[in-house]
């Protein structure tokens, strides 16, 4: 196979700029300074001004405006992937969480069904987001396919409307169609039809691809999308702030996911016995950016609700910044950024970023069922089964110095067993 998309091997100057020493130093410095490059005190003041407590909300939870939608959303959003008990979501509402994110492709629709049990009791307490998933559609989906998908979500959620529907996993690598899924006129027509019928209020886009900046910039500039759902953490690449600023200027809400930077060693020893956790520190770092609307994080228990809700309305301490800097120094060259820079170097067309993302779900997030189903949904050739006999062309192509081949072998060993069904 001839690889002509881009040179997968950075030139000497680029490799030098991204040397392990400099990379770790840059990561640690970014964490220590806080997001946006401002001082910690300035960030805390700006974030406090951007967020506010609602009159009838529980003490502690802060709220921000979701871009031009005008909707007030809790700083901590409920990620619905692992939920099994609707009472956990109702408990989150008691703690002030009003934003819930789900999808028909989460656990075969079980996430939506469980959330629907809670919505049937207290729909008025929640801002509900679901998704249009590429797993359900062909290469050129028609308008009715989108409408049928939304109707299925509404039935499972036991509601007559959702607040936001996200065109999910847009990007060049997600389906090989470039920006076609983002700008599909059938999707846009379906949204307008559903909106007129009162089934949805706002349209958004979400994605994991390495071309995140290009795709989401296009989404902002198109004027079609009211909300973006993007990864954002203290280990993400520095120019992501440009996208956040662009979205803010256009009035597009920016919701953050993948906020824990891999969650390796999620409760580090230096936090044990204190009033904060690593996860709280990571969430506070995200919320220090006054231009993000809120964040979503997977929640399955009341304990997690309490832990994550405590991150709202409180500024990072110096000890927390130092701990995140130590984490960055320890794990920066072990965590995939899903940038896709290494993929053109692969002679087997392995979906490297996807495989490592699903491995993260399995090993770090503990979401084993989701990881197994997602990996099984990849075409067999796109999985990492061919990596054992490959010398590892991906390794020198990684800008972050990751042992990519070893990570892929680990992923395939955990996820490669056959399953009877793919992601729904």
Model-derived regions, located:
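Structured C-terminal cap/extension of enzyme domains
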Residues: 38, 224, 242-424
């Amino acid at each position: 196979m001839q690889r002509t998309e881009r040179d997968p091997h950075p030139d000497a100057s680029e490799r030098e700029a991204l040397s392990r020493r400099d990379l770790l130093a840059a990561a640690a410095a970014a964490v220590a300074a806080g997001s946006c490059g401002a001082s910690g005190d300035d960030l805390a003041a700006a974030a406090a001004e951007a967020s506010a407590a609602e009159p009838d909300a529980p003490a502690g939870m802060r709220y921000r405006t979701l871009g031009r939608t005008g909707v007030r959303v809790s700083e901590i959003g409920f990620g619905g992937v692992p939920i099994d008990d609707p009472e956990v979501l109702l408990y989150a509402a008691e703690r002030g969480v009003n934003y819930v994110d789900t999808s028909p492709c989460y656990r075969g629709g079980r996430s939506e069904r469980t959330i629907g049990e809670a919505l049937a009791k207290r729909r008025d307490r929640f801002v509900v987001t679901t998704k249009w998933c590429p797993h359900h559609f062909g290469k050129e989906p028609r308008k009715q396919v989108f409408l049928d998908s939304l109707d299925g979500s509404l039935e499972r959620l036991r509601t007559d409307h959702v607040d936001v529907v996200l065109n999910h996993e847009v990007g060049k690598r997600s389906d090989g169609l470039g920006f076609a899924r983002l700008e599909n006129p059938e999707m846009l027509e379906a949204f307008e039809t559903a909106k007129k019928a009162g089934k949805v209020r706002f349209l958004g886009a979400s994605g994991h691809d390495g071309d995140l900046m290009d795709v989401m910039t296009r989404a902002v500039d198109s004027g079609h999308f009211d909300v973006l759902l993007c990864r954002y953490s203290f280990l993400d690449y520095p120019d992501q702030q440009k996208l956040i600023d662009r979205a803010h200027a256009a009035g597009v809400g920016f919701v953050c996911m993948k906020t824990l930077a891999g969650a390796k060693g999620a409760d580090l020893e230096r936090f044990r016995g204190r009033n904060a956790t690593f996860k709280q520190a990571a969430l506070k770092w995200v919320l220090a950016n006054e231009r993000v609307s809120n964040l979503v994080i997977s929640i399955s228990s009341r304990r997690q609700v309490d832990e994550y809700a405590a991150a709202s309305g409180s500024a990072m301490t110096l000890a927390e910044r130092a701990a995140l800097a130590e984490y960055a120094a320890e794990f920066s060259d072990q965590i995939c950024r899903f940038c896709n820079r290494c993929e053109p170097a692969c002679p087997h067309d392995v979906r490297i970023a996807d495989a490592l993302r699903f491995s993260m779900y399995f090993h770090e997030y503990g979401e084993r069922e989701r990881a197994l189903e997602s990996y099984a949904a990849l075409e067999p050739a796109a999985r990492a089964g061919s990596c054992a006999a490959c010398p590892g062309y991906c390794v020198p192509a990684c800008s972050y110095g990751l042992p990519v081949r070893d990570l892929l072998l680990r992923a395939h060993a955990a996820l490669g067993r056959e399953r009877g069904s793919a992601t729904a």
